[in-house]
């Protein structure tokens, strides 16, 4: 996703669409595990990926990765390192993000596990309840 005002090969004149937080969108849509990491700390990314895969239910993991060929080069980030430095400047651990004033949060993205609901009913389990209710000609009880 290209941030508003930046340009790439597919957004030659710059992105005019508002930047939005995909993790907030997915969390609001009902995902029971939502996380974000960056390529800057591969070990942390790996640990979070394992958590996402082990989580029972819908998991979403957003990874901020450098795109030095298109996004970086076209937006005055002359190297892969410069692109990673930009990613580092807009991301910070959720615990630190939560301590910021609202005005300081604009343009920043928290990293780590952002939502984890271990008690959420997993979709396939819910569907089994629908099938059982259909078989018994009753209303589904969730």
Predicted regions span which residues?
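Flexible, low-complexity linker and terminal segments
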Residues: 67-142
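Conserved thiamine diphosphate
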Residues: 4-51
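Active-site rim beta-loop-alpha module in soluble metabolic enzymes
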Residues: 27-38, 53-56, 60-72
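Short, surface-exposed, charged loop/turn segments at secondary-structure junctions
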Residues: 1-6, 42, 49-54, 72-85, ...
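Glycine-centered flexibility motif
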Residues: 1, 14, 57, 110-114
């Amino acid at each position: 996703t290209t941030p508003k005002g930046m340009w790439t090969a597919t957004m030659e004149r710059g992105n005019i669409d508002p930047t939005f937080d995909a993790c907030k969108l997915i969390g609001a849509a009902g995902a029971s595990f939502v996380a974000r990491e960056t390529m800057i700390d591969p070990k942390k990314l790996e640990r979070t990926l394992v958590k996402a895969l082990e989580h029972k239910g819908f998991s979403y993991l957003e990874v901020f990765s450098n795109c030095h060929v298109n996004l970086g080069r076209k937006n005055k980030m002359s190297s892969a390192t410069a692109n990673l430095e930009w990613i580092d400047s807009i991301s910070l651990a959720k615990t630190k993000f939560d301590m910021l004033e609202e005005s300081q949060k604009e343009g920043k993205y928290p990293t780590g596990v952002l939502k984890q609901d271990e008690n959420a009913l997993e979709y396939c389990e819910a569907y089994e309840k629908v099938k059982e209710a259909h078989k018994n000609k009753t209303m589904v009880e969730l």
